[in-house]
Amino acid sequence: MSKKVSKNVAKARAAVEPRPYTLQDAVPLLQQVKFAKFDETVDLTMRLGVDPRHADQMVRGTVVLPHGLGKTKKVAVITTGDRQKEAEAAGAEIVGGEELVEKIQKESWTDFDALIATPDMMRSVGRLGKVLGPRGLMPNPKTGTVTNDVAAAVKEIKAGKIEYRTDKTALVHVPVGKLSFPAEKLIDNAMTVITSVVRAKPSAAKGKYIKGITLSSTMGPGIPLDGSVADAAAKA
């Protein structure tokens, strides 16, 4: 890291006081301390009071961001027959059947942001776990990416639908837009995600569920949010 960047990082961090912020204050502050020359992604990180080693405490879900992510996702669909035409008409960039499964398997090819499959193709798609799993691309009925209604699934993803899940350390990382977005849109997207995660609380989770929330950008500092954000989400 160059001295100039180091100075910028230090200056940005110094602008964040050692206290929790409201979401309404955190977003403008993150935009104010921007120094990168590219349009950074804004990320939300939530620390949850769950033990992800237990399947009944795994938090996983999907949410459609009201203002999208500022980029169009490339969608692939594995299906057959007329549903291939439906997927293409809905805007899927990559559509195929067994030949697409074979390409992904042989070449470890994942030049797409989301993958949808129809139930009849899951026996074949199941062979792709080693390629798709580590990249978070494996279709799953719980996230709506295993479905016969491929057109609706493609449109949802194009509209800003994203998937989230806890990692091994009980953190959920979710992008909520670009730093160039108006503050109101970033706030709306962030609240939509927080509300979804709050509602996804497993019944097996005991004690405090939302242990901490941090807002950050690609190059910017992490800004801790206060408990009122989660409280508001719980009432939404």
UniProtKB/Swiss-Prot annotation:
InterPro entries attached here?
A: Ribosom_uL1_bac-type (IPR005878), Ribosomal_uL1 (IPR002143), Ribosomal_uL1-like (IPR023674), Ribosomal_uL1/biogenesis (IPR028364), Ribosomal_uL1_3-a/b-sand (IPR016095), Ribosomal_uL1_CS (IPR023673)
The reply to whether Ion transport figures as a keyword in the UniProt entry is: no
Q: Name one GO molecular function term.
A: structural constituent of ribosome
Lineage: superkingdom: Bacteria
PROSITE patterns assigned to the protein according to its UniProt record, in alphabetical order: RIBOSOMAL_L1 (PS01199)
**Is the keyword Ribonucleoprotein in the record?**
yes
Pfam hit, one = Ribosomal_L1
Gene Ontology BP term (one): regulation of translation
Q: Which UniProt keywords apply?
A: Repressor, Ribonucleoprotein, Ribosomal protein, RNA-binding, rRNA-binding, Translation regulation, tRNA-binding
Q: What GO cellular component is one of the record's annotations?
A: large ribosomal subunit
Q: Which family does it belong to?
A: Belongs to the universal ribosomal protein uL1 family.
Q: What is the role of this chain?
A: Binds directly to 23S rRNA. The L1 stalk is quite mobile in the ribosome, and is involved in E site tRNA release. Protein L1 is also a translational repressor protein, it controls the translation of the L11 operon by binding to its mRNA.
Subunit and partners: Part of the 50S ribosomal subunit.
- Entry-linked PANTHER family: 54S RIBOSOMAL PROTEIN L1, MITOCHONDRIAL, LARGE RIBOSOMAL SUBUNIT PROTEIN UL1M
Q: What is the name of the protein in this document?
A: Large ribosomal subunit protein uL1
